[in-house]
């Protein structure tokens, strides 16, 4: 029993759990269990009363709801590190911002260069700009204490800025319409959170209440609802009025739910991609090449190059006691686009099979390549 407890509480176990549920989802989707798997996650669940109801399929409740809690955790960790930890220095926090910019601009340019002559294909230019923070973190968890905290923090920070960039891209280029009323309600909720923070109120139930209203308004606004988690994290106080740690305690309570329940469930719901109708030859189509080269090469080169230039111009600095060799390994992991890229793919091509699933296959290939190469590289490099 002690051995099982030790294994479950180890740093690598959450990563193993995530990988296990990823392959379980692929197995279910590509076997006789496919119909049961699809029906289960597409089953509608309705929450509400009288004239106010939210009805969504289970996979959307997970992707829009539970993942907002994951983003809340990441936001809390980032806030703590910026105010009290390793990112207090402006040059330290600017590094992931430059990395995120490079990781979005370079893949997009690669995709555009390959697909510029095909109007419909060009709708997918943003597909290789995304990083799946959940899976990238999962690979880091597998490496355990081999990766310094400062590098883990860099990846988390970069992925947040990257996902914020993705949310802006979705809002500007892939949202049919925005609801003005819902956005006004969002602003009122943000003002309420600001007041709670200003008066140093540490009743978690009040933050939950305002947070739920903010999440619903965000959902109805047309902006991706997971952004609500990041916004809430900005306003949770660091300490109580008696100067006792508060934010850290909230993070400690939420973290087990995220790593042992939310992330594995997210992997199981999203990794189920039917690869039976995909043809390996379609990997060499322009759309596929744009996605694969954009995610696998564009991401790592863009992140590293932008960071390197920023460091040389003294606009940012490399984390303490970290060499460029190890740093490059983290840059490789940013090419894991997986569920975030699949999400943008669905918005760009409206789930069309015009490319015979070559786009989805390319996302899988590039993401697995980035994960495997990044893992091996970080395992070898000292």
UniProtKB/Swiss-Prot annotation:
Keywords: Antiport, Cell inner membrane, Cell membrane, Ion transport, Membrane, Sodium, Sodium transport, Transmembrane, Transmembrane helix, Transport. PANTHER family: NA(+)_H(+) ANTIPORTER NHAA (PTHR30341:SF0), SODIUM ION/PROTON ANTIPORTER NHAA-RELATED (PTHR30341). Na(+)/H(+) antiporter that extrudes sodium in exchange for external protons. Belongs to the NhaA Na(+)/H(+) (TC 2.A.33) antiporter family. This is Na(+)/H(+) antiporter NhaA 2. The keyword Nucleotide-binding does not apply. It is a multi-pass membrane protein. One of its GO terms (biological process) is regulation of pH. It is found in: Cell inner membrane. It comes from the Bacteria. One of its GO terms (cellular component) is plasma membrane. Pfam families: Na_H_antiport_1. The chain crosses the membrane at residues 7-27, 58-78, 94-114, 124-144, 153-173, 178-198, 199-219, 255-275, 291-311, 327-347, 361-381. InterPro entries: Na/H_antiporter_dom_sf, NhaA. The keyword Transmembrane helix applies. It catalyses: Na(+)(in) + 2 H(+)(out) = Na(+)(out) + 2 H(+)(in). NCBIfam families: NhaA, PRK09560.1, PRK09561.1. One of its GO terms (molecular function) is sodium:proton antiporter activity.
